Amino acid sequence: MVKQIEFKYAFQEALNSAGDK
């Protein structure tokens, strides 16, 4: 469960980074 949350967080961060760029 924790791994899933971490993955979701990393995915959202990547999306945010891509949107920022």
From Swiss-Prot:
The modification N6-acetyllysine is found at residue 3. The keyword Transport applies. It is found in: Nucleus; Cytoplasm; Secreted. Keywords: Acetylation, Activator, Cytoplasm, Electron transport, Nucleus, Redox-active center, Secreted, Transcription, Transcription regulation, Transport. It comes from the Eukaryota. Signal peptide: none annotated. Belongs to the thioredoxin family. Homodimer; disulfide-linked. Interacts with TXNIP through the redox-active site. Interacts with MAP3K5 and CASP3. Interacts with APEX1; the interaction stimulates the FOS/JUN AP-1 DNA-binding activity in a redox-dependent manner. This is Thioredoxin. It comes from Canis lupus familiaris (Dog).
